[in-house]
Amino acid sequence: DYMFYFQGEIMSQKAVKRLYLMQVGSMPEYQIPIVCYLVQTEDGKNILIDSGLPEIIPEEGSDFENGQDVIEQLASLGLKPGDIDTVISTHYDLDHAGRHAAFTKAQYVVQRGHHLDAASNPRYAATRPQWDQPMDRIRLVDGDTELLPGLELIETSGHVPGHQSVLVWLPKTGAILLTVDAVPFSEGFTRDEQDDGSNPDAEAIRASTIKLLDLVEREHIGLVMFGHDQEQWETFKKAPEFYE
Protein backbone atom coordinates (compact mmCIF):
# COMPACT_ATOMS: atom_id res chain seq x y z
CA ASP A 1 0.00 0.00 0.00
CA TYR A 2 1.85 3.06 -1.26
CA MET A 3 -0.03 5.53 0.95
CA PHE A 4 0.76 3.58 4.08
CA TYR A 5 4.40 3.40 3.08
CA PHE A 6 4.44 7.12 2.43
CA GLN A 7 2.86 7.92 5.81
CA GLY A 8 5.36 5.61 7.49
CA GLU A 9 8.14 7.55 5.81
CA ILE A 10 6.71 10.82 7.09
CA MET A 11 6.32 9.48 10.64
CA SER A 12 9.85 8.12 10.67
CA GLN A 13 11.13 11.65 10.05
CA LYS A 14 9.48 12.95 13.22
CA ALA A 15 12.09 13.64 15.85
CA VAL A 16 10.05 13.26 19.04
CA LYS A 17 10.39 10.13 21.17
CA ARG A 18 8.56 10.69 24.48
CA LEU A 19 6.19 13.06 26.26
CA TYR A 20 6.17 13.28 30.07
CA LEU A 21 3.42 15.00 32.07
CA MET A 22 4.23 16.54 35.45
CA GLN A 23 1.89 18.07 37.99
CA VAL A 24 3.94 20.64 39.89
CA GLY A 25 1.24 22.37 41.93
CA SER A 26 -2.44 23.14 42.20
CA MET A 27 -5.14 25.66 43.01
CA PRO A 28 -6.58 23.63 45.89
CA GLU A 29 -9.79 25.61 46.26
CA TYR A 30 -10.75 24.97 42.63
CA GLN A 31 -9.11 21.53 42.29
CA ILE A 32 -7.05 22.74 39.35
CA PRO A 33 -3.71 21.09 38.46
CA ILE A 34 -0.65 23.21 37.57
CA VAL A 35 1.38 21.27 35.03
CA CYS A 36 4.55 21.14 32.93
CA TYR A 37 5.52 18.85 30.07
CA LEU A 38 8.83 17.35 28.99
CA VAL A 39 9.48 16.29 25.40
CA GLN A 40 12.45 14.05 24.63
CA THR A 41 13.71 13.73 21.07
CA GLU A 42 15.28 10.79 19.26
CA ASP A 43 18.64 12.56 19.34
CA GLY A 44 18.58 13.04 23.11
CA LYS A 45 17.35 16.62 23.46
CA ASN A 46 15.23 17.61 26.46
CA ILE A 47 12.55 20.21 25.78
CA LEU A 48 10.56 21.56 28.72
CA ILE A 49 7.16 23.14 28.11
CA ASP A 50 6.53 25.69 30.89
CA SER A 51 8.15 25.58 34.33
CA GLY A 52 5.32 25.89 36.85
CA LEU A 53 5.06 28.07 39.94
CA PRO A 54 7.86 30.08 41.56
CA GLU A 55 9.56 28.59 44.61
CA ILE A 56 8.17 31.38 46.75
CA ILE A 57 4.69 32.31 45.62
CA PRO A 58 4.00 36.07 45.71
CA GLU A 59 0.94 37.52 47.39
CA GLU A 60 -1.12 37.77 44.21
CA GLY A 61 -0.69 34.02 43.74
CA SER A 62 -2.18 33.06 47.09
CA ASP A 63 -4.67 30.69 45.39
CA PHE A 64 -1.74 28.56 44.19
CA GLU A 65 0.12 25.86 46.07
CA ASN A 66 3.40 24.23 45.10
CA GLY A 67 3.60 20.46 44.91
CA GLN A 68 6.61 18.46 43.77
CA ASP A 69 8.26 21.12 41.65
CA VAL A 70 9.63 20.73 38.15
CA ILE A 71 13.25 20.42 39.35
CA GLU A 72 12.42 17.52 41.70
CA GLN A 73 10.34 15.82 39.02
CA LEU A 74 13.11 16.12 36.45
CA ALA A 75 15.54 14.73 39.04
CA SER A 76 13.33 11.67 39.43
CA LEU A 77 13.84 11.12 35.67
CA GLY A 78 17.60 11.46 36.11
CA LEU A 79 17.77 15.00 34.72
CA LYS A 80 19.41 18.11 36.14
CA PRO A 81 18.34 21.67 35.19
CA GLY A 82 21.46 21.90 33.00
CA ASP A 83 20.20 18.96 30.91
CA ILE A 84 17.29 21.01 29.56
CA ASP A 85 18.13 22.27 26.06
CA THR A 86 14.98 24.27 25.35
CA VAL A 87 12.19 25.82 27.42
CA ILE A 88 9.03 26.50 25.44
CA SER A 89 7.17 29.38 27.10
CA THR A 90 3.47 29.11 26.39
CA HIS A 91 3.12 32.44 28.24
CA TYR A 92 4.59 34.23 31.25
CA ASP A 93 1.83 33.79 33.84
CA LEU A 94 2.86 32.93 37.39
CA ASP A 95 1.89 29.26 37.13
CA HIS A 96 3.66 28.71 33.80
CA ALA A 97 6.96 30.62 33.97
CA GLY A 98 7.81 30.49 37.68
CA ARG A 99 11.04 28.46 37.35
CA HIS A 100 12.41 29.56 34.00
CA ALA A 101 15.65 30.96 35.42
CA ALA A 102 16.68 27.55 36.82
CA PHE A 103 17.46 26.30 33.31
CA THR A 104 20.72 28.12 32.77
CA LYS A 105 21.76 26.28 29.59
CA ALA A 106 18.40 26.39 27.82
CA GLN A 107 17.18 28.48 24.95
CA TYR A 108 13.74 29.97 25.67
CA VAL A 109 11.18 29.92 22.86
CA VAL A 110 8.27 32.36 23.03
CA GLN A 111 5.96 34.21 20.66
CA ARG A 112 7.42 37.61 19.79
CA GLY A 113 4.09 39.33 20.48
CA HIS A 114 3.92 37.86 23.95
CA HIS A 115 7.49 38.73 24.91
CA LEU A 116 7.10 42.32 23.71
CA ASP A 117 3.77 42.75 25.50
CA ALA A 118 5.18 41.31 28.72
CA ALA A 119 7.90 43.95 28.96
CA SER A 120 5.42 46.65 29.97
CA ASN A 121 2.58 44.54 31.36
CA PRO A 122 2.26 44.48 35.19
CA ARG A 123 0.59 41.05 34.91
CA TYR A 124 4.04 39.48 34.37
CA ALA A 125 6.03 41.60 36.82
CA ALA A 126 6.18 38.84 39.45
CA THR A 127 7.77 36.37 37.02
CA ARG A 128 9.99 38.93 35.29
CA PRO A 129 13.23 37.72 36.96
CA GLN A 130 12.41 34.31 35.47
CA TRP A 131 11.56 35.18 31.86
CA ASP A 132 13.53 38.40 31.31
CA GLN A 133 16.64 36.65 30.03
CA PRO A 134 19.44 37.92 27.76
CA MET A 135 18.14 38.16 24.20
CA ASP A 136 20.80 35.79 22.89
CA ARG A 137 19.07 33.06 24.92
CA ILE A 138 15.55 33.84 23.72
CA ARG A 139 14.17 32.71 20.39
CA LEU A 140 11.22 34.85 19.36
CA VAL A 141 8.83 33.13 16.95
CA ASP A 142 6.09 34.70 14.85
CA GLY A 143 2.89 32.69 14.72
CA ASP A 144 2.64 28.97 14.02
CA THR A 145 6.14 27.48 13.91
CA GLU A 146 7.57 23.99 13.44
CA LEU A 147 10.26 23.89 16.11
CA LEU A 148 11.49 20.53 14.86
CA PRO A 149 9.84 17.64 13.00
CA GLY A 150 7.02 16.44 15.24
CA LEU A 151 6.91 19.51 17.49
CA GLU A 152 4.82 22.49 16.42
CA LEU A 153 3.99 25.73 18.19
CA ILE A 154 0.46 26.96 17.54
CA GLU A 155 -0.22 30.65 18.16
CA THR A 156 -3.40 30.89 20.25
CA SER A 157 -3.82 34.46 21.51
CA GLY A 158 -6.84 35.24 23.69
CA HIS A 159 -6.07 34.11 27.22
CA VAL A 160 -3.17 36.51 26.76
CA PRO A 161 -1.66 38.09 23.61
CA GLY A 162 0.85 35.71 22.02
CA HIS A 163 -0.13 32.61 23.98
CA GLN A 164 1.03 29.41 22.28
CA SER A 165 -0.26 25.85 22.37
CA VAL A 166 1.92 22.86 21.38
CA LEU A 167 1.32 19.98 18.97
CA VAL A 168 3.46 16.89 19.59
CA TRP A 169 3.68 13.91 17.19
CA LEU A 170 4.70 10.66 18.90
CA PRO A 171 5.75 7.44 17.14
CA LYS A 172 3.12 5.19 18.79
CA THR A 173 0.46 7.51 20.23
CA GLY A 174 0.33 9.79 17.21
CA ALA A 175 -0.57 13.45 17.59
CA ILE A 176 -1.21 15.03 21.01
CA LEU A 177 -2.38 18.64 21.26
CA LEU A 178 -1.46 20.53 24.43
CA THR A 179 -3.94 23.41 24.46
CA VAL A 180 -2.47 24.90 27.68
CA ASP A 181 -4.48 28.03 28.62
CA ALA A 182 -6.02 28.56 25.18
CA VAL A 183 -8.58 25.96 26.31
CA PRO A 184 -8.02 25.20 30.01
CA PHE A 185 -11.06 22.92 30.44
CA SER A 186 -12.60 20.31 28.13
CA GLU A 187 -16.07 21.89 28.27
CA GLY A 188 -14.62 24.99 26.60
CA PHE A 189 -13.57 23.02 23.50
CA THR A 190 -16.68 23.79 21.46
CA ARG A 191 -17.73 25.92 18.53
CA ASP A 192 -20.64 27.31 20.54
CA GLU A 193 -20.61 30.90 21.74
CA GLN A 194 -19.65 30.73 25.41
CA ASP A 195 -19.09 34.17 26.72
CA ASP A 196 -21.59 36.54 28.28
CA GLY A 197 -19.70 39.49 26.82
CA SER A 198 -17.90 40.42 30.04
CA ASN A 199 -14.50 39.17 28.89
CA PRO A 200 -12.76 41.72 26.64
CA ASP A 201 -10.72 38.91 25.05
CA ALA A 202 -13.71 36.65 24.36
CA GLU A 203 -13.46 37.10 20.60
CA ALA A 204 -9.78 36.19 20.46
CA ILE A 205 -10.33 33.21 22.78
CA ARG A 206 -13.13 31.99 20.53
CA ALA A 207 -11.01 32.43 17.39
CA SER A 208 -8.16 30.42 18.94
CA THR A 209 -10.57 27.72 20.14
CA ILE A 210 -11.99 27.35 16.63
CA LYS A 211 -8.47 27.34 15.19
CA LEU A 212 -7.59 24.38 17.45
CA LEU A 213 -10.85 22.55 16.70
CA ASP A 214 -10.07 22.92 12.97
CA LEU A 215 -6.52 21.66 13.55
CA VAL A 216 -7.79 18.57 15.41
CA GLU A 217 -10.16 17.76 12.53
CA ARG A 218 -7.63 18.43 9.80
CA GLU A 219 -4.78 16.46 11.39
CA HIS A 220 -7.00 13.74 12.93
CA ILE A 221 -5.53 14.42 16.37
CA GLY A 222 -6.49 11.61 18.72
CA LEU A 223 -5.63 13.19 22.06
CA VAL A 224 -6.26 16.75 23.20
CA MET A 225 -4.87 17.64 26.65
CA PHE A 226 -6.46 20.69 28.26
CA GLY A 227 -4.34 22.99 30.41
CA HIS A 228 -6.03 22.79 33.81
CA ASP A 229 -8.71 20.09 33.63
CA GLN A 230 -8.53 18.04 36.83
CA GLU A 231 -11.00 15.37 35.73
CA GLN A 232 -9.16 14.78 32.47
CA TRP A 233 -5.75 15.06 34.14
CA GLU A 234 -6.57 12.15 36.45
CA THR A 235 -6.92 9.87 33.42
CA PHE A 236 -3.41 10.58 32.08
CA LYS A 237 -0.08 8.85 32.64
CA LYS A 238 2.23 11.06 34.73
CA ALA A 239 6.01 11.03 35.03
CA PRO A 240 7.91 8.76 35.46
CA GLU A 241 5.46 7.10 33.04
CA PHE A 242 5.34 8.62 29.56
CA TYR A 243 3.61 8.67 26.20
CA GLU A 244 5.63 7.43 23.24
List PLM regions with ranges.
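The start of beta-strands in P-loop NTPase/AAA+ ATPase cores
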Residues: R18, K45, T86, A106, ...
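Hydrophobic/aromatic beta-strand patches that form the interior of the parallel beta-sheet core
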Residues: Y20-M22, I47, I88, V109, ...
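A short catalytic or substrate-binding loop motif that flags glycine-/basic-rich loops and adjacent residues
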Residues: E29-I32, S157-P161
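Metallo-beta-lactamase
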Residues: P54-I57, Q68-L79, D83-D95, Q107-E155, P161-K238
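Short, conserved loop/helix-junction motifs that constitute active-site signature segments
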Residues: H100-T104, L170
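Zn-dependent metallo-beta-lactamase
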Residues: M3-G61, K211, R218, T235-E244
